[in-house]
Amino acid sequence: MVGSVPLNLRTWAAPESVHPEQINGKCIDARGANWSEQDLGSQDLRNANLCRCDLRGCNLSRCQLEGADLRLARFDSATTVQEGFDLFNSGAVGPGAKLNGAFLNNADLRGIDLRGAVLMGAYLSGADLSGALLDGVSLAGSDLRFAILRGAMCRATRFGTSQLDLADFRGADLQDAALDNVESIKGADFSHCSGLNEQITHLLNRSAMELDHWNPLTRGTTRTSLESLRSPQS
């Protein structure tokens, strides 16, 4: 059963393959569909399942979205919705989203724009944030263990008391990022990061248990990755 409608295997299509022009009737299931850059006209999307749908650049300004499940749907500054619809508190992920305490474990957030978003206490363990825009974002108290932030833009990102065990920061831009109060960096890899010059010494004063923990993915320790960032004269 999908919703309250019997499942007809002859006409069934995978949710992620559903295109806007195929929508008809009730119980719309478009989980994981790519609707980026689409103009959805005046579609009735009330109570639709749009979880994980890519809505970046999507025109939803004439669509009815009341009751739609938008958890983990991706949007950007070009996404438009009907006046009065609160996209930022809908569970969707994008710039300005209110995601305090959100469960985003293992989520695919590659290249997502989260500037202006609030993610305090968010559960991001194992999430892939490669190439994400996290400039100025507050991640205080977040669980970022095993998270992938390769090449992410983390300028002035506030990591507060977050957990960074085995996080992969390789190639990330950490200019002015606040890392002084993080709970742990055990096994985290900072190889090829930029912007950490003024914090390297402070981070290398953390416990040996954190600094010498082996990261089986990047095949190195936190200490080695931080020391590799030091200029020859340091």
Briefly describe each language-model feature range:
Residues 3-234:
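Tandem repeat scaffolds
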